[in-house]
């Protein structure tokens, strides 16, 4: 992983147009793991090194959080490793699913978003754990790839999830309410004040702009998908009516003209707070209605954006505050894990809401003409906010790109900083680059709309290419002077056989674009080796050394990443090897890792991931081979083996003649004086 230093990306000139050198770029950012990204991600570069570095780092986060569940396919996780409140044994959480799907819609391998959506709408997922915008995100995926069957097949499940929220709907107010903790935002004004300022982790139920915006967006998505499927006029009418009713109630009841902001009203009624009263301050959550295009385009509502820019209100030196300094309990720390501060939303910067605000701002700048004409906020502000968000990804103490849970708004330093916090996938970024800064605005119609949102005095050039859209491959380029790419202005390329569209200004352009069929997902083998958690009896791992379930589980849990920090360690670790020949002690010249499937299975190939880090003392083995347990109970090398050379911090491929066995073993020779970390031994 090569993400600690800004890199000068290389371009070549081809027929007058700049083409990014994918091999060089991916090698620089991902090292030996570059093949995973090669045919999957759009390429991007810009004159701002932080934006470029963060873009590729965010794809490494995406890659790290694709957990293989075996027959269930892939899901996106929120934390790198297991946490107690995840849905077991899968390790799923639904609060950030919307972000995960929006990032995944730009991945050329559609399997990740499709497997994930299938799982999240299944009965094995905890679909009600947190408030969510899953249906809306699935629809937004359709706007990119145009695959009708991918969205219509989930229509029934979407309605089941939507209707389940009736228990949180107040018919007298026409609004949904939620406990802030279930809104994934503990310690808000409503929960702290409901406790009398004593706590705020639980309680504080409120009618919030967040959940009502999510339900508005989900209702619109269900109506759109039903219309797409056809023959469901009643469903279309029902959900459009629900969306419209929510829209009006949010605007009528949650807009506070004094604060010029959408804010909570209390659902809870106790000695500290009163039912239906407004909370006593602005929160960043009040900008979420624009994330989902809920507000009407009125000058009155547009004034809310002024508070996002005000340094004494929601704009902190290092990022957007979740609450304002004027609040009595702003940044008061209530909750700890030992001596470490825990998660709170009473002022800290959260990438979660940063993403929502920037998504909403892109919507506002793109199609709210009355609001934008006020000049209350501009593309220059979008650029500044996006750049500040990008900088948040790099820890100022270590200089390493490592996104964590929340940050101090004055310093940009992580607040929580627990082991679970590193490389946290609880937000989006690359969707903001592609649909915001670069400006590809996905549509259900057969058009390509490009409306870049950036400050030309700050961003002098950028290029994004290999972007999937409606079955086409799109490239979008800006060069203020023409000195970087050899072509001045905005350039749009569609596939390889279409003329280039160009214009001198970075302004909105709409191009008719008949859609092609969406590409099929990559054909992916089903892994048979995945142990979903340590309590699942089979498959299970054993090893010649460090042989405990807690150790071996990490090498067969379906997770692959190569972050070079000890806090992000992943896999089974063997101690330092010496030159003796014993195979059952710490001094093994040859070591092994075994998988017991619990029954006879057919195995014929493997993907093997070894970690290497000079600073941590890990090296990939010098050689390896695969063995299976024969019917007589003895181990033997597989027949017809084709072993690729060992790849450190990447995937080593192995194939052999398919064979039935209950157990398979990876035997390897470590480097003398070095430790070995087996990140994953995935068997097919």
How would you label these PLM feature ranges?
Residues 230-268, 303-471, 528:
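Non-catalytic carbohydrate-binding regions of carbohydrate-active enzymes
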